[in-house]
A protein has these predicted regions:
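Structural motif corresponding to alpha-helix initiation and N-cap regions
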Residues: 20-21, 39-46, 60-64, 85, ...
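Short gly/ser/thr-rich secondary-structure transition/capping motifs
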Residues: 34-40, 57-58, 133-141, 182, ...
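N-terminal glycine-/charge-rich "phosphate-binding" loop or analogous flexible N-terminal tail
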Residues: 1-52, 268-282
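Phosphate/diphosphate ligand-binding glycine-rich loop within oxidoreductases
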Residues: 53-129
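Rossmann-like dinucleotide/phosphate-binding beta-alpha-beta segment
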Residues: 5-6, 21, 29, 136, ...
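Oxidoreductase and adenylate-handling cofactor-binding alpha/beta cores
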Residues: 111-130, 167-174, 241-254
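Rossmann-like dinucleotide-binding domain for NAD(H)/NADP(H)
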Residues: 99, 177, 181-282
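A short, aliphatic-rich alpha-helical micro-motif
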Residues: 48-49, 67-70, 148, 216-217
Length: 282
């Protein structure tokens, strides 16, 4: 018989917000217990969340091995939209819901950041700043710079964020292309003079120890920011509130608002119930 008096537990596997006050207020108000950790490996996740009823993760990997070790987990919530840190197929096989935060939580922030990187790269802002601080007061430091108006901006996709970037770019007189063939031509023929990146391949925030050895850091025509495009105080509050509220909804018997595998888990549960019913004595 299930223990209906047991207090359910939520484990925040990792976070870099400085505190969990927002999450704690939401989770404890629902009568749930909150435990926090700073997991940097699947072993860390297993140690922290083996008996948890729910997990919230920012960067920590919750892979198949960790999922198979979970004894009570009902839901894994991601701080953010992408769920690449979670093995969704493994979670589905174990009947665990995986939730995310719909993309509009930081749509404007990412579009603004992309335009900031574009403008900084196009106008050689970093190069000018470094030269000026070093005592070099010459406009020629940035040569060559070309006007944006009449130029072309290539987008790798044309989802909501890309469309928001396109609207902003149009205000600067840029022609927007979202054609793979056109973008390939621009890249392969060397039309692109610089790059603005909000992350690098190794995603330093996921690593226990990191040193800036990526060769991109040695290029003066590349601007790199630390996966910060989504950031604004308002966006951070939204993502934390939504993730915490999702686990509360699931653990209190309500449907989540943004489950990436909700249909599959519901189908698997119905199939399991049917098998139990078919095998029950008459």
């Amino acid at each position: 018989m299930a223990d209906t008096t047991r207090q359910k537990t939520v484990v925040i596997a990792d976070y870099d917000y400085g505190d969990v006050d927002i999450e704690r207020a939401i989770i404890e108000a629902a009568g749930l217990r909150l435990i926090t950790a700073q997991c940097k490996s699947e072993d860390d996740v297993i140690a922290a969340a083996r008996d948890a009823d729910a997990i919230i993760a920012q960067y920590a990997t919750v892979g198949a091995r960790a999922i198979s070790a979970l004894t009570r987990c009902e839901v894994i919530a991601r701080y953010g939209t992408g769920t690449d840190i979670v093995d969704v197929d493994a979670a589905t096989q174990h009947g665990i819901l995986v939730t995310n935060v719909p993309n509009d939580w930081c749509e404007n922030e990412v579009a603004d950041h992309a335009m900031a990187l574009l403008l900084a790269a196009a106008r050689k802002i970093i190069r000018y700043d470094q030269a000026t601080r070093a005592g070099v007061w010459r406009w020629q430091t940035g040569e060559p710079i070309h006007r944006l108006s009449g130029g072309t901006l290539g987008l790798l996709s044309f989802g909501a964020i890309a469309q928001a970037i396109g609207r902003r770019a149009a205000g600067f007189g840029l022609r927007v292309i979202a054609s793979d063939q056109a973008l390939f031509k621009a890249l392969s023929q060397g039309w692109i003079a610089g790059a603005g990146l909000d992350d690098i391949e190794e995603e330093p925030a996921k690593l226990r120890d990191w040193t800036p050895a990526n060769p991109l850091f040695g290029l003066d025509n590349v601007i790199i920011t630390p996966h910060a495009a989504y950031y604004s105080e308002e966006a951070i509050r939204t993502v934390r509130d939504f993730a915490a509220s999702e686990v509360v909804r699931v653990l209190t018997g309500q449907p989540p608002l943004s489950a990436v595998n909700g249909v599959q888990v519901a189908s698997a549960r119905r199939a399991a119930d049917s098998r139990l019913t078919a095998g029950a004595p008459t």
